[in-house]
């Protein structure tokens, strides 16, 4: 007898003499063997199940994705060294920040390329773009022949390279972990929030890497992504996991959550104590590197377990073949009494509509999604890009401390959705991504208004809030795209969505630079000092974020039915009759 709606637990296989034997299809830890006579003493061999890809290979691809995400934010350290660039006005600095985002306008090319080109090559192309974009700037930064438009184009090229690596990471997380795709995506993308922290720690650990701070960061931005991409390229493969042990999945994700929390805690502690000596910075970098390497233990442990299972299976088959010639074998695998509950993914009753191409642009939901993202997540990114100038205008000397703080809290913000997805799946419920985004935008709007207070404490608190919410919105948006428009055209659809980032970066960044320059001009100076420099900007940004929150609420109301289409996980008791 089998549970309703599930395939029968027992299948028949014809024996050589016309008799039947039964083999249970339920994976278990207990095996019962009996014998029955067959004609002529013929020996019967059990059919072996189809081999599926090793589960350790899936986790190896996720570890590779995590490492790629960790270094795939070289543009996030721009606020640290932007003030070091000579002969560049505040407006031009904002245009350079926009240039990195402008590369995302052509990010959809990476989605198309991923349909026809192996993923390691796609990632390598992205790393090459970054190597050329930042490497040429490093070599020619002090050259009088380097014009502003050269910097703009090179920065845009490097920004486009980020899209290529992100596309690879998203596809690996979505397709290699079909039953836990939202958890895998959120977990992997959370490490992108550590990029600024990693680059600032590397720069502080190796202060003599170049003759200026700007050149140090440009060199790291050019070289580090290429080194990591080449190192992890063999693991960047798609697999078809035909049999998935939910118990193993849950255990592995719980271990990964613990490692991730420890990594985030290390980053926050390092951000708070970033004014320590160089030796302390090196020790912190070593501890952070060790924690980033620890996830490799998960696929290693899974590989050892798989090898042990193969050895056990080979011994069992040898015992079967060594049985007497006058007997046939009936193998019935039953569920261990202590592990009777098994999680099964129930197929969707209502298939989700797949939307892509020009059809996407005709959907009102897309434009609600586009502008709500622009007025929240993109706005937060513009704020983070301007942290250097904001800190300088308020008289804060250690800009890297503020940038590291925003990076560390952005990491936890990106990690938050993975916890929500994991525990909601365990409880059999699904959380609307658009509803999550709307709930994250409200505190972000409050943080912008909080910045109107000139105190340094409010600047640090608001930076932490905006960093957390921006990271969470960015992570949630990856799953929201497939939730709203389907997973088939995800690579192209999400790159079309993130084209709002360069548009918003240009509008919000240029407007803030214009107000900054106007305030400085009114004082008869080239730079502006004091809380009033960005006061009008923060008020306008806060109001804009409120509008984005309202748009996202409307999108949530329109798309609530999508949450019901997501797979539901049920617990059932396996029985063998």
Which residues does each PLM region occupy?
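Intracellular juxtamembrane helix-capping segments at the cytosolic ends
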Residues: 85, 162-186, 387, 472-485
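Interfacial helix-cap and linker-helix signal at transmembrane-aqueous boundaries
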Residues: 85-86, 113-114, 203-211, 273, ...
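Hydrophobic core of transmembrane alpha-helices in multi-pass small-molecule transporters
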Residues: 146-164, 458-472
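C-terminal ends and interior cores of transmembrane alpha-helices
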Residues: 128-144, 443-454
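Long, low-complexity inter-transmembrane loops of multi-pass membrane transporters
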Residues: 10-14, 18-46, 236-362, 368, ...
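Central cavity-lining transmembrane alpha-helices of secondary-active solute carriers
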Residues: 97-115, 404-418
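C-terminal transmembrane helical hairpin of 12-TM major facilitator-type secondary transporters
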Residues: 369-371, 375, 379-381, 394, ...
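Extracytoplasmic gate region of multi-pass secondary transporters
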Residues: 78-79, 271, 358-407, 508-509
């Amino acid at each position: 007898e089998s549970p309703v709606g599930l395939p029968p637990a027992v299948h028949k296989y014809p024996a050589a003499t016309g008799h039947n034997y039964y083999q249970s299809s339920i994976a278990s830890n207990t095996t019962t063997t009996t014998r029955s006579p067959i004609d002529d003493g013929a020996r019967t061999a059990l059919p072996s199940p189809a081999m599926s890809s090793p589960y350790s290979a899936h986790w190896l691809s996720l570890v590779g994705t995590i490492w790629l995400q960790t270094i795939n934010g070289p543009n996030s350290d721009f606020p640290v060294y932007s003030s070091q660039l000579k002969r560049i006005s505040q407006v031009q600095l904002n245009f350079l920040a926009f240039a990195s985002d402008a590369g995302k306008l052509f990010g959809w090319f990476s989605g198309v390329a991923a349909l026809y080109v192996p993923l390691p090559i796609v990632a390598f192309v992205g790393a090459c773009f970054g190597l050329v974009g930042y490497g040429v700037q490093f070599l020619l930064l002090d050259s009088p022949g380097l014009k502003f438009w050269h910097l703009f184009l090179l920065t845009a090229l490097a920004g486009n390279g980020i899209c290529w690596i992100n596309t690879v990471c998203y596809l690996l997380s979505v397709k290699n972990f079909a039953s836990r795709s939202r958890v895998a995506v959120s977990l992997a993308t959370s490490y992108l929030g550590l990029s600024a922290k990693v680059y600032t720690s590397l720069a502080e650990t190796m202060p003599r890497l170049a003759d200026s701070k700007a050149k140090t960061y440009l060199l790291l931005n050019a070289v580090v992504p290429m080194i990591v991409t080449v190192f992890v390229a063999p693991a960047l493969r798609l697999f078809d996991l035909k049999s998935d042990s939910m118990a193993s999945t849950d255990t592995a994700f719980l271990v990964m959550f613990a490692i991730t929390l420890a990594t985030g805690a290390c980053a926050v502690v390092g951000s708070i104590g970033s004014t320590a000596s160089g030796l302390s910075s090196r020790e912190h970098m070593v501890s952070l590197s060790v924690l980033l390497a620890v996830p490799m233990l998960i696929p290693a442990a899974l590989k050892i377990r798989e090898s042990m299972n193969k050895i056990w299976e080979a011994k069992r088959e040898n015992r079967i073949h060594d049985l007497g010639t006058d007997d046939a074998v009936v193998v019935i695998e039953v569920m261990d009494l202590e592990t009777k509950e098994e999680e099964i993914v129930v197929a969707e009753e209502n298939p989700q509509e797949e939307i892509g191409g020009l059809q996407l642009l005709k959907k009102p939901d897309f434009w609600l999604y586009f502008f709500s993202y622009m007025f929240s997540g993109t706005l937060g990114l513009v704020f983070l890009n301007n942290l250097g100038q904001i800190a300088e205008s308020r008289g804060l000397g250690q800009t890297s401390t503020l940038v590291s703080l925003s990076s560390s809290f952005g990491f936890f913000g990106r990690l938050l959705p993975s916890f929500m997805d994991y525990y909601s799946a365990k409880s059999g419920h699904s959380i609307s991504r658009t509803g999550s985004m709307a709930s994250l935008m409200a505190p972000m709007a409050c943080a912008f208004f909080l910045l109107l207070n000139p105190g340094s404490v409010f600047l640090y608190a608001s930076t932490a809030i905006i960093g957390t919410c921006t990271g969470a919105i960015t992570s949630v948006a990856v799953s929201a795209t497939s939730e709203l428009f389907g997973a088939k055209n995800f690579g192209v659809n999400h790159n079309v969505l993130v084209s709002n980032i360069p548009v918003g970066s240009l509008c919000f960044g240029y407007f803030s630079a214009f107000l900054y320059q106007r305030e400085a001009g009114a004082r008869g100076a080239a730079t502006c000092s004091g809380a009033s420099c960005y006061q009008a900007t923060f008020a306008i940004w806060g109001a804009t974020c409120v509008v984005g929150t309202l748009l996202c609420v409307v999108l949530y109301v329109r798309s609530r039915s999508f949450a019901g289409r997501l797979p539901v996980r049920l617990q059932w008791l396996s029985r063998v009759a």
